[in-house]
Amino acid sequence: MDLQLKGRKAIVTGASKGIGLRIAQTLAGEGVDVAICARTAADVEKAAAGLRSQGVQAFGDAVNVADGGAYTAWLESAVERLGGLDIFVHNVTASPATPGLAGWDLAYRTDILGAVNGVDTLTKHLRKSTAAAIVFIASISGVMSKVLPAPGAYAYGASKAALISYGAQISKDLAKVGIRVNIVSPGPIYFEGGPWDRVKARAPQMLEAAKESCVIGRLGEPQDIANAVVFFASPVSGFTVGQNLHVDGGFMQHVAF
């Protein structure tokens, strides 16, 4: 199937490793030019170099999305350097390992305000696209309690719930100006350096319990999420608006009407 993505332009946040990197790589594999950001310069440049090796225009910068002024300035610069914008993937998230009020503040500024700043800054550019798409990366933690055993799990889950609600609400208005908004909510996704990797080191029995809860018989991989995101980003999903897709290997037990 031709996803009709070749030559399009995308911004992916939090894309130096894990899910974000795999999303950027999968977009690049479809011929999409990609701008990425994350907090660590060396990781960003390594990721961007890998994307360029896929034969597309790609660049990245060290940006803290929680710093709204710096982030919005980078977004404007990224659009200019890309020469336009078709796809915005808000993937960045605050670490659920941050406890207490600091974790709540970081989750609010990164997950929620990061999405708001991204949408507010990029809407005028996306409106110029013939097939504009926004994809938020949330989590099944936004609709379930105590999915991830981490000190900042409460803030993490609440911020993802807010992100799901925000995405669903703006999807109705932005669709009227040609911008589709959808949400992907991952279940337990394992990758080196990720939250479930930390669970494996600290409490391997919890990792095994999560694996057993996935009826498909394994934890997810970043590629599982990237596949869903790239579908939502493509014109092939042009009749899909405001959806929250659970990609969780059957982890959730309730019926999602």
PLM segments and residue spans:
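A glycine/serine/threonine-rich, flexible loop-to-helix segment
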Residues: S53, K176, P186-C214, H254-F257
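Catalytic loop of short-chain dehydrogenase/reductase
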Residues: A94-P99, V135-A162, G167-K176, P188-I189
